[in-house]
Amino acid sequence: MTSRAKKRIVLPTRPEPPSIEQILQDVHGAIASDPVFICDFSDDSSLSNNATLCEKEKQYWQSCNYVDMNNKLKEALIQLKAKCDVLRSAGEKLEEDIENLREATM
């Protein structure tokens, strides 16, 4: 019997990967003591390796927080510029109204 004559096994299709929302829901739903989110220092031989991994993890989260804060600051800057423009135009209108009142009283 040749290999072509053998019946091919049909494998099931691969499931779709989870959506970003599903991943975020899983991460946010995880408890703090989840083994994925903690560093285990019980093995002394891998202590330095784990410490390095924990430090990298800490730096990663600090970087993520920095990026988030930077994005929030950019949004705040845009909002403040818009409010500044509104206040500037209101101040100019107020000065015009004051000048008109001065002229009207004279």
Curated annotation (Swiss-Prot):
Give the residue range of the signal peptide: none
Give the InterPro entries listed for this entry. Answer: UPF0449
Question: Which Pfam families does its entry note?
Answer: UPF0449 (PF15136)
Q: Which family does it belong to?
A: Belongs to the UPF0449 family.
Q: What protein is this chain from? A: UPF0449 protein C19orf25 homolog
